[in-house]
Amino acid sequence: MENAAKALSIAGGVLIAVMLAVLVYYVFTHWGDSQRASQEDIEIQQVEDFNKSYLSYEKVLYGSELLGLVNKMSDYNISDDVKYSGYSTMNLSMKITDRTTGNLFSNGTYSLSSISNAINTVMNKTVNSNKYKGQISDSQWEYLAKSSTSTKFNDLCTELKIPSSINRDQLKSDAVEYYKYVQFKRKKFKHIGTEFSNDGRVSKMSFEETN
């Protein structure tokens, strides 16, 4: 009897241990699946939110709005998401159809970096130039740009109280470049395509000049 009781006790202990092991396995597996599903939901939502902030540009844009998108993508390309999370950099394609000479961008197709570089070149020669900083405001550049081809440019400089220490010929030349930038901001561009990376995120957007 004593041996039988011992055997039953051992069998009961083994059964309880097995049941506990099964329970632990079930709980752990279920928790893991739940965590994975939750993480997947978060990632899907992140992709949707990311795309939403770019897909809103799928329309006809003014050049000024397109430059806003260029800056947005350029900032993203140097963000921590790209540096540390392994996300792909973004790109943008801009097709210029106007064959008129003397524009900021001549006829052709331009990438995100080439657009950004062209704009930075103009800004560095004008608004951000050390020789003009603190002496010519952004609003004054607008006026100077519009009159950059006028014979009354010097009169405007006097009216705007531009310091006489600034070389007028050089200023006029730089104002011509700024005017090209002003004209570009007024152009219109239609959206012609969006590409996505393997993770479902927007990776490239394409635009073409339109009337």
Language-model features, listed with the residues they occupy:
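N-terminal single-pass transmembrane signal-anchor helix
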Residues: E2-T29
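N-terminal export/assembly leader peptides and their processing motifs that target proteins to secretory
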Residues: Y26-N211
